Amino acid sequence: MRSSMLVLFLIFSAQAVAPIIGVLCSVTTAQQDHPTSIPTVDPKLFNKRRHLSPRVLFSSQPPDAEPAGGQGVSRRTRRQPQHRGVYSVCESVSVWVGNKTKATDISGKEVTVLPYVNINNVKKKQYFFETTCHSPPSGGSRCLGIDARHWNSHCTNSHTFVRALTSSENQVAWRLIRINVACVCVLSRKSWQH
């Protein structure tokens, strides 16, 4: 029930933002002549609420904390029980990613993520707060606490779309790109064998 509601929410969200996928940024003529140069972005663009996401950060130095309202590192084996018997079935790791160069936009097209931008003559790097599944050393990704006699299970990354400064076909623009935000358990019933 929850997963179907989540799927519907994602579909409606994607349809709602489809008309506003690429908000173009102002790029100077010199930057258009030299596409490898660092684009200068108008700081007023960051005042618009629709461009802000707690999972995207522009900073001149690496962030040392999780975003506001974030969940941080979620490792079931190292946490104290905080939720009175409620445990995560998939171990996950959350980190700020600063070396993202390529991403998939909401249209399914691969775009180039701008690693650096100039904001008020300060070179800032674009960081993304991503949560991915923690792979155990054995390589298995079975969900924890699932009855393996009756269920097949594996942990997989779940995604969302966030606004990021990207370049595609020589146009610098805000685009919705896909990032990893959770590690979820996928279940399927084992076939009944007599």
Swiss-Prot record:
**InterPro entries attached here?**
Cystine-knot_cytokine (IPR029034), Nerve_growth_factor-like (IPR020408), Nerve_growth_factor-rel (IPR002072), Nerve_growth_factor_CS (IPR019846)
- Propeptide residues are 31-79
Disulfide connectivity for this sequence is: C90-C155, C133-C183, C143-C185
Q: Which SMART domains match?
A: NGF
GO BP term, example: nerve development
Q: Which residues form the signal peptide?
A: 1-30
**Where is this gene product found?**
Secreted
Segments carrying the region annotation (Disordered) are 56-81
Subcellular location, principal: secreted
- Annotated Gene Ontology cellular component terms: axon; dendrite; extracellular space; synaptic vesicle
Report keywords, A-Z. Answer: Cleavage on pair of basic residues, Disulfide bond, Growth factor, Secreted, Signal
| UniProt-recorded Gene Ontology molecular function terms | growth factor activity; nerve growth factor receptor binding
Q: What is its quaternary makeup?
A: Homodimer.
Biological function: Nerve growth factor is important for the development and maintenance of the sympathetic and sensory nervous systems. It stimulates division and differentiation of sympathetic and embryonic sensory neurons as well as basal forebrain cholinergic neurons in the brain.
Q: Which family does it belong to?
A: Belongs to the NGF-beta family.
Name this polypeptide is given:
Nerve growth factor
Q: From what organism does this protein derive?
A: Xiphophorus maculatus (Southern platyfish)
